[in-house]
Amino acid sequence: MLAAEPELAGARNEKGQSALLLTAYSGNKELCDVLMACGVPLELHEAAALGRLERVKQLVEEMPAEAKTYSPDGFPVFALAAVFGHLEVAEYLFSKGADINAAATNGTGYNALTGAVASGHTAIVSWLLANGADPNYRYGNGFSPLLTAAANGHLGIVSILLASGADLHVKTNDGKTALGFAQERGQAEVAEFLRSHGAA
């Protein structure tokens, strides 16, 4: 179908999300490659999500304020680079004025740190925290990066967050703790680590 109608690769839904961006969200790298081969020029949020640093640089150099913009579905371009694990892109956007704590405008409240934590990108989490990301940022139902890391079993990230000042005793709006999430999800190593740091 794409061979006959390559313009479909640039199609967008009612939220303004392109086929390429939705494919990136799904993690299907092979299909992303197929869509990009159709020659549709990448917009900044797509280039950031896909880690295309040269395209990101080209677009930001043409319009510097773009480094601080959002995708059509409300995510900071900077956060998309972080959630998909593209440290060089995140570093570049930050150097051009992207707000390290910028939150999504779509009701999720996600930012670069929450996305990198959820995706398990330890190096990016460390870099974000070293450059001013808030380790106690709250979003959704009172979630924090530590709660997400504990629930997902990311022990290294839990350690980095605590070393960066994350509140060990933080609770969601319905009273769940990092230790509670770790135990509930069977994350035994994380649970033991949290207990060794005073969680109860």
Identify the residue ranges that each predicted region occupies:
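Alpha-helix initiation and capping sites
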Residues: 2-5, 28, 37-40, 52, ...
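Ankyrin repeat A-helix N-terminal signature
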Residues: 22-28, 46-52, 80-86, 115-121, ...
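Conserved small-residue-rich
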Residues: 48-89, 98
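Leucine-rich solenoid repeat scaffolds
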Residues: 17-32, 36, 169-200
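Conserved ankyrin/ankyrin-like repeat signature
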Residues: 30-31, 55, 88-89, 123-124, ...
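Ankyrin-repeat boundary/"N-cap" motif
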Residues: 12-18, 41-46, 69-77, 103-112, ...
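Ankyrin repeat domain, specifically the short helix-to-loop turn at the C-terminus of the second helix
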Residues: 2-7, 34-40, 60-65, 91-99, ...
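Ankyrin-repeat and related helical/solenoid repeat scaffolds used for protein-protein interactions
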Residues: 136-184
